[in-house]
Amino acid sequence: GSAILGLILGLMLLAYPGYLAYRASRLPAISDITTDPSNPPRFDVLARLRPRGSSDYPGAAVARQQTAAYPDVAPLQLNVPIKVAYDTTLALVNKRKWHVVDARPPAAGRRDAVIEAVARTPIMGFRDDVVIRVTATREGARVDMRSASRYAWHDFGTNASRIRSLLEDLDDSVGATPVPRPEQKSQPPRGQPAK
């Protein structure tokens, strides 16, 4: 009886490292993922918390590996005003209990709204840094995201999964939210001058 229990416990202890080894063999050894490799969202406040030299996006070679491994990690275009996109994104970040270190809402004279936050990996609790950029477009708003492990050289797909999950939830949430319409000026009754 105790030998079988010991064997089961041993297998359970080896299961997670085995799973990571399997993931490592199938995924590229990268740990900085973004929806926009040509112009990735930048760490600003988080740059002070990251190891020296790790805040800049790693470049074209990593972008090629990312595109091959995670072709679905792409910007999200929403047909809602930037304020709705930003507020919904911030609500989802808070719901996930990520630690928000900076939140810059849309404002006159500011091109992008930005959220910077620290997320933790589910099992080991490692810190990963996240920056989300919301930009006004003619159609509504575009959301770009970057998720980077603070210390790891291989993220085992965690950052891509985090981006996918947030953007899918954002798309679903915005689709279920009524879009505020601009106020319309009331038309005067026929035969009366406009005020």
Residue ranges and their predicted role:
Residues 1-6, 10, 16-195:
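Ser/Thr-rich, low-complexity intrinsically disordered terminal regions
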